A protein has these predicted regions:
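C-terminal amphipathic alpha-helical interaction region
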Residues: 4, 8-16, 24, 28-30, ...
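N-terminal interaction modules that seed assembly of large macromolecular complexes
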Residues: 16-48
Length: 124
């Protein structure tokens, strides 16, 4: 979509409608389903707004850590294999801030408010 409203704005409006007027008009088990639908619309909205940048950042961070290029999935598979081997403590320490940054980016999309963890004092 090129003009306004954007897809993200439409999803926000759908979520607002579901969580406002629709939720107030229903009762019983359907209320839970309406809440879930509203939450899903908000997740997709945030994915549209933040997902591309988060994926680019993940690919760059993991690629830099590994000194490799590839798709995000390929780089993550290589990272998992290196960590699973558990034979390089220095690599594991270097991976920690990368994994935390990637996780916080994903939380910003999936569960905002849980993405504010301060891991500056964390030690591996």
């Amino acid at each position: 979509m090129q003009d306004r409203p954007t897809a993200a704005e439409l999803l926000r409006d759908i979520a607002d409608l579901l969580e406002g007027d629709v939720l107030a008009a229903v009762s019983g088990p359907i209320q839970h389903q309406v809440r879930v639908a509203g939450n899903l619309a908000r997740i997709v909205q945030r994915e549209l707004e933040l997902g591309r940048e988060a994926n680019f950042r993940e690919r760059a961070l993991v690629g830099d850590l590994l000194g490799a290029e590839g798709s995000t999935a390929e780089l993550n598979a290589e990272l998992a294999a290196r960590l699973r081997a558990n034979d390089d403590p220095e690599f594991a320490r270097a991976a920690w801030p990368v994994l935390m940054a990637v996780t916080l980016d994903k939380l910003a999309i999936d569960k905002p408010g849980h993405d504010a963890y301060d891991f500056a004092g964390e030690q591996l």
